[in-house]
A protein has these predicted regions:
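Context-gated lysine
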Residues: 11, 29-32, 49, 56-57, ...
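Oxidoreductase and adenylate-handling cofactor-binding alpha/beta cores
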Residues: 1-26, 32-121, 136-146
């Protein structure tokens, strides 16, 4: 998204400004079904069987009973995979339900409630303040050199989708377009009118195989440096595909977008980066 240069030495074409809108629309206490009463945990809720957001339905019925003890089940209890393999489904389900049933009361100190995750907690009672629908728009102006033209990128994060924790998108260019999701990439050439779909190798692990991919590339980069084949900066560019500064910038842009969202403003990316990051680095 930061449009790093393809060749070392080229000037990066970075966004000129960005803005963001969004809020927590649905998962608020005011939207809690009246029939749920004062329940703060799914397992003690009178409408658990009818609620589509039941923790028991999500973790136990949808995942564990179908043989999946990995994400998201193992987030509740990291030992659940070993339990399922060694003791069977009944024991694993008993352990998982016990964890999901952990609850608090009105007498529980607020600090204690906030200090830990409650995986069986009512989704409308949670203290989560992450937007369930947010859009970020980044805008580039014409580049000073290299013929890099103006462009716009829009990122939409929404909770209400069949593709939970999956990414999909489209890139519209002057000569064609690219459409992708977590399993395939489709390219369309405007000149020929032809479309072609590619199915890359799917790796295991978290983030759609991204965790394994990053770890592999990091090991390759370290090996290249230790063996004297490349310098650290060269290895990082070749195997990781970005510099440390670009990593920091990509994370910083999230904070800039949040500032834009909260203040309902348009944020100048160069000025924000200078004021919030570079000036502070130089002052320490």
């Amino acid at each position: 998204m930061l449009s790093a240069p393809a060749q070392a030495g080229e000037k990066a074409h970075q966004p000129a400004f960005l803005t963001s809108t969004g809020r927590l629309n649905f998962f608020r206490k005011s939207r809690k079904p009246a029939a749920a009463g004062t329940a703060t945990n799914c397992l003690s809720c009178p409408i658990e069987k009818e609620c589509m957001y039941s923790a028991k339905k999500i973790y136990v019925e949808r995942h564990l009973r179908n043989g999946n003890a990995k994400w998201p089940v193992k987030i509740v209890n990291p030992e659940i995979e070993d339990c399922l393999a060694a003791q069977g489904l009944e024991a694993a389900e008993e352990k998982l339900v016990r964890d999901l049933g952990e609850d608090y009361t009105a007498a529980t100190p607020e600090g204690q409630v906030r200090s830990r995750p409650w995986f069986g907690r009512c989704v409308w009672e949670a203290d989560n303040d992450v937007c369930d629908d947010q859009s970020v728009t980044m805008t580039w102006e014409d580049g000073d050199e290299g013929g890099r033209g103006a462009k716009t990128a829009q990122f939409h994060m929404v909770a209400f989708t069949a593709k939970i924790c999956e990414r999909r998108g489209r890139i519209y260019g002057t000569k064609g377009e690219v459409e992708y999701d977590s399993t395939s990439i489709t390219t369309h050439d405007f000149a020929s009118g032809r479309s072609e779909t590619h199915h890359p190798e799917l790796r295991g692990g978290g983030h759609g195989g991204g965790d394994e991919g990053l770890a592999t590339q990091f090991v390759l980069a370290v090996a290249a440096v230790k063996e004297g084949k490349l310098g650290a900066a060269e290895a990082q560019q070749k195997f990781i595909g970005c510099t440390l500064e670009e990593v920091i910038q990509s994370h910083a842009m999230v904070f800039a977008a949040e500032e834009a969202r909260r203040q309902r403003s348009v944020v100048s990316w160069p000025l924000w980066w200078q004021r919030k990051v570079l000036d502070k680095l130089h002052s320490t």
